[in-house]
From Swiss-Prot:
Catalyzes the transfer of an acyl group from acyl-phosphate (acyl-PO(4)) to glycerol-3-phosphate (G3P) to form lysophosphatidic acid (LPA). This enzyme utilizes acyl-phosphate as fatty acyl donor, but not acyl-CoA or acyl-ACP. GO terms for molecular function: acyl-phosphate glycerol-3-phosphate acyltransferase activity. GO terms for cellular component: plasma membrane. It comes from the Bacteria. Probably interacts with PlsX. This is Glycerol-3-phosphate acyltransferase. It is found in: Cell inner membrane. It comes from Allorhizobium ampelinum (strain ATCC BAA-846 / DSM 112012 / S4) (Agrobacterium vitis (strain S4)). The lineage of its organism: Bacteria, Pseudomonadati, Pseudomonadota, Alphaproteobacteria, Hyphomicrobiales. The chain crosses the membrane at residues 13-33, 63-83, 94-114, 127-147, 151-171. Belongs to the PlsY family. It is a multi-pass membrane protein. The gene is plsY. Keywords: Cell inner membrane, Cell membrane, Lipid biosynthesis, Lipid metabolism, Membrane, Phospholipid biosynthesis, Phospholipid metabolism, Transferase, Transmembrane, Transmembrane helix.
Length: 209
């Protein structure tokens, strides 16, 4: 991805990119799918989260997988749409902001009182839209840490740390900065998980409780 030429990006384009991203990102697929499936309000079970992990607590694996996919793709769509409308071969800021805004929309959806998911799926979806190679890097890191630790949350957290570093090494400072911000926010949303990891009470992959 070439360096961004900020002089070619208008304020209107930036605002529109953010708006498109936020609106797409704020679609609560986890909540919508569980309601349509007759499983009630997913916010009333488990962690109260609208993401795929909490949807899985309903016992419906297919619905959880669908939630994961849709939460990722809404961020990908936001990045691609913003880039197509306002970006160019040398100007990628609209796409980057579209994906970032979708990530924020998922975490803080206005329709649900700004209480959304934890952002891992939309983080991955944003990567798919702005730098697809990083999805492979994320997957490799996640699988490696999961194999060693059996902690899903730890795997995701470590992967989000690696991505900005990898982008910086590859000469993508703008994408590195945006994903760094996303990483900080993701860690903040996983505060409870981090506390459980430290205390040794975090649930491991394949184990209940």
């Amino acid at each position: 991805m070439p360096s961004l030429d900020y002089s070619q990006v208008t304020i209107t384009a930036l605002i529109a990119s953010l708006a498109i991203g936020y609106l797409l990102g704020s679609i609560p697929f986890g909540l919508l799918l569980t309601r349509m499936a007759g499983l009630g309000d997913v916010r009333n079970i488990g962690s109260g989260n609208i993401g795929a992990t909490n949807v899985l607590r309903t016992g419906n694996k297919k619905l959880a997988a669908a939630t994961l996919l849709l939460d990722a793709l809404k961020a990908t769509a936001a990045a691609l749409i913003a880039q197509k409308l306002f970006g160019s071969d040398t100007v990628h800021l609209p796409g980057l902001l579209g994906g970032f805004a979708a990530f924020i929309g998922h975490l803080f959806p206005v329709w649900l009182g700004f209480k959304g998911g934890k952002g891992v799926a939309t983080y991955i979806g944003t990567l798919l839209g702005i730098f697809p190679l990083m999805v492979l890097v994320f997957a490799i890191v996640w699988l490696s840490i999961a194999f060693l630790s059996r902690y899903s949350s730890l795997s995701a957290l470590v992967a989000t740390l690696v991505i900005p570093v990898a982008l910086w090494i590859l000469g993508q400072p703008e994408a590195a900065m945006i994903t760094s911000a996303m990483t900080v926010i993701t860690w903040g949303k996983h505060k409870a998980n981090i506390e459980r990891l430290i205390s040794g009470t975090e649930s491991k992959i394949g184990k209940k409780g």
